[in-house]
């Protein structure tokens, strides 16, 4: 993620980053650290309920809701303030986009969106909200694409794979990257 942040920030300086499904802040810390090294002023929006998985539904074979609730906003804030020391972040506590999207300025453009929500409906809602706010060349990273417990996310990515305005690739770590072409 650090290299991806560097590449996108180089092409689109100042483009914001959105992470939905922050859990304990590990990926947020990596991205913030990279932005700090780059002396960027991009805003990182970190959206999480801090109460576990939300919107689990019939397209998800493993999750029923509430899993991964062993976190808190304070854990994430401590990590960002003491480890990455990157000041330009905003925590959006609640279900995104339903409860917290209004906290993002309407003209904000994103270079990266990291979706780590584990379930179909939540991932779809985030993708549909962010796509028109993504810069050309921007990337949506689906953290859970290749995991047997996240079949809903795999299904979602496959549904969007052949749209002409994007390219989808995946790696051996289970991530899918959806790159906006136009």
What is the predicted function of each stretch?
Residues 6, 10-182:
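S-adenosylmethionine/decaboxylated-SAM
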Residues 1-4:
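A short, well-structured juxtamembrane/interface segment
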């Amino acid at each position: 993620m650090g290299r991806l942040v560097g590449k996108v920030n180089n092409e689109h300086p100042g483009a914001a980053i959105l992470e939905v499904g922050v859990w304990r802040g590990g990926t947020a810390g990596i991205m913030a650290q990279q932005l700090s090294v780059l002396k960027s002023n991009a805003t990182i929006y970190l959206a999480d309920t801090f109460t576990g998985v939300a919107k689990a539904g019939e397209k998800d074979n493993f999750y029923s809701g509430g899993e991964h609730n062993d976190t808190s906003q304070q854990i994430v804030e401590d990590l960002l303030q003491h480890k990455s020391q990157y000041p330009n972040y905003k925590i959006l506590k609640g279900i995104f986009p339903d409860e917290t999207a209004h906290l993002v300025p309407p003209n904000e453009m994103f270079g990266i969106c990291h979706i780590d929500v584990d379930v179909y409906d939540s991932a779809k809602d985030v993708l549909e909200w962010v796509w028109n706010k993504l810069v050309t060349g921007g990337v949506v990273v689906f953290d859970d694409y290749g995991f047997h417990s996240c079949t809903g996310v795999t299904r979602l990515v496959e549904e969007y794979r052949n749209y002409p305005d994007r390219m989808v690739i995946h790696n051996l770590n289970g991530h899918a990257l959806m790159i906006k072409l136009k």
